[in-house]
Structures are given as structure tokens and as C-alpha cells.
Regions:
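Activation segment
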Residues: 80, 97, 154, 211, ...
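Hydrophobic alpha-helical segments that form the core
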Residues: 259-267
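ATP-binding pocket architecture of kinase catalytic cores
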Residues: 21-146
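An alpha-helical support segment within catalytic cores of ATP-dependent transferases
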Residues: 2-4, 8, 82-83, 120-193
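Active-site Asp-x-Gly
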Residues: 142-149, 158, 190-193, 200-259, ...
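Conserved N-terminal boundary motif of the eukaryotic protein kinase catalytic domain
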Residues: 12-19
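ATP/Mg2+ or Mg2+-diphosphate-binding catalytic cores
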Residues: 269-289
Length: 289
């Protein structure tokens, strides 16, 4: 069964056209037009691990639930549970992209602050589903320091060691950072509702200048993590961060912790891409060892 047939069964409508979309580095993405007038976004990942799209769909629904930030609605999801012949897929409502307006960045900052303030029941995920291409664990943890150490830094240290991308001395430094999070991590905070992979490519702007969040690695975490990701890869204006801080001020010393929260994504990228990410990850790790 091809993807078009799977979509027709899931959406109870005939696919009249499908167009491949560029930009995804993991899944194959498509725009599909249906005979009932709907246009949808669909993607498939033929070598995805078990539960890949179900996890993403749950994350999207969790971010969407408080109704404080725009997140595309999930129309259908399958991880191949309808039969081996049916490709796995995730179908979302279509967002017509446009250009940012004068208030786009500030509006996103306020919306993200509101999202974080809705909170999470734990650090991690209650459903314990792993996220991301590296399958990082999300076991529920009572504190951020325990979560970041046991569910991010230490698993990444093992992956980096196995891949050989980081020197043994840097792996030891990373393990030392995991042990020092109570010292370098700032004051304790309650778990925030995080997007978890918030770089510029995971934000769409529609024709009204409204920001939409996509492709999350959603979990309960430290709100500084989302903001550190946004600063790491760019794509967000200073008006966004200023509006966030006005709505939800950060604890003293947050500037000195930005690189701490960037360690995890930098190591992930070092493992995946090598190159300059290896040096950037090493620099961040050595800063907090």
C-alpha cells in the first residue's frame, strides 16, 4: 500500500494530488490535496523506530492542549499498526506560510512564556516515550538536575563514546558536568511544558504573521532549555526573547547557563554531523566541568 492509499483510508477522502516537499532531514514530507477540498501535510519515515510518529503526535497534542501557542492539529497517525503493507505516517492540518509581521517575534515570546507556565507533571514524560533521532530517554524525574544528567548528558556521553566523536577526556568532562548540575544549574524550578527542539526550522509563520510550532521533542523540562536552543541555531529575533522575559523573567545568572543547556543539542549534532559541532560541544562541556 502506498502513502496516498493510506491517507485516503485514514481521512475518508480521495487524494487528488500529492507534492513532495523539501526540508525534512529525517522523514519524507508531502502536501496532499483531497477531493473534499482539504489540503493536508503528511510525512512518512520508512525506517523509523517503533512508535516514532505516535510519540510526535502525542507531543503535538500536549503542546496544543493549553491553547496558548499555535500548533497544527493531528488529523491521522499510524506507526504501521494497520498492517505491514501500510506505510507509517503523520498527517497534520496544512499551514499556509507567509511573512513575519511587526509583532510576530514578540507574540511568539509571550506565547512561549504562557506555554512554559502551564507546566508539566514531571521532568521527562509520563508516557516514558523516547524522543529524537537518537532515542533519548524521558523517564520521569523529580528534579531538573536528575533529568538532565540521567536522561540527556550521561546517555549522550555513552553514545559519543561509542561513536568516537569526542575524545575520552571530553567524555570524562561530560560525566563530571552531569555530577555538578546542582552546583552550576541555577536555582530549582518546576518542570515547564517544553517544545524540546525549538530551532528556527521548527517554527512556521503563516500569512497572518502568526508563529506555529512543529516537530517537537516535547517533554517536561527547564524552560531555559527551549530558549538556549533558540539562541544556538538562530531564527528568532531579540523582540521574542524580550517579550518572553517581560512575561516570565528568568532567574539571575541565566546568561551563564545558556551554554549548559546547549551541551545536549551540541553533542547530538556532533554525533550526527561531526565538523564544527565537535569543537563547540567540547568548549561548552569544558566550561562547566
Amino acid at each position: 500500500m502506498d502513502l496516498a492509499v493510506a491517507l485516503e483510508r485514514a481521512l475518508d477522502a480521495r487524494v487528488v494530488s500529492m507534492r513532495s516537499l523539501r526540508g525534512g532531514d529525517v522523514a519524507e514530507a508531502y502536501r496532499a490535496d483531497l477531493d473534499d477540498g482539504r489540503r493536508v501535510f503528511a510525512k512518512t519515515h520508512r525506517s523509523a523506530p517503533a512508535g516514532f510518529f505516535t510519540t510526535e503526535a502525542a507531543g503535538l497534542a500536549w503542546l496544543r492542549a493549553p491553547m496558548v501557542v499555535a500548533v497544527p492539529g493531528v488529523l491521522a497517525v499510524s506507526d504501521g499498526d494497520t498492517g505491514a503493507e501500510a506505510p507509517n505516517h503523520l498527517v497534520l492540518e496544512w499551514i499556509d506560510e507567509g511573512s513575519a509581521g511587526p509583532s510576530t517575534e514578540a507574540d511568539l515570546g509571550r506565547a512561549l512564556a504562557a506555554l512554559h507556565l502551564t507546566g508539566a507533571p514531571c521532568f521527562g514524560r509520563e508516557d516514558r516515550r523516547s524522543t529524537g533521532s537518537r532515542g533519548l530517554p524521558n523517564e520521569p524525574c523529580p528534579t531538573w538536575s536528575e533529568f538532565y544528567a540521567t536522561q540527556r548528558l550521561l546517555p549522550l556521553a555513552r553514545l559519543a563514546g561509542a561513536s568516537g566523536v569526542l575524545r575520552a577526556s571530553v567524555i570524562s568532562d561530560l560525566e563530571r558536568v552531569a555530577d555538578r548540575l546542582d552546583v552550576v544549574g541555577g536555582p530549582p524550578e518546576s518542570p515547564a511544558r517544553l517544545h524540546g527542539d525549538l530551532w528556527g526550522g521548527n517554527r512556521l509563520v503563516d500569512r497572518n504573521g502568526r508563529s506555529w510550532l512543529i516537530d517537537p521533542a516535547a517533554h517536561g523540562g527547564h524552560r531555559e532549555f527551549d530558549l538556549a536552543m533558540m539562541r544556538l541555531f538562530g531564527g528568532f529575533g531579540e523582540a521574542c526573547f524580550a517579550a518572553y522575559a517581560e512575561q516570565c523573567p528568568l532567574a539571575d545568572g541565566w546568561v551563564d547557563r545558556v551554554a549548559l543547556h546547549q551541551i545536549a543539542p551540541l553533542v547530538v549534532h556532533a554525533i550526527k554531523f561531526g565538523g564544527g559541532y565537535v569543537g563547540a560541544a567540547t568548549t561548552a562541556i569544558e566550561r562547566y566541568r
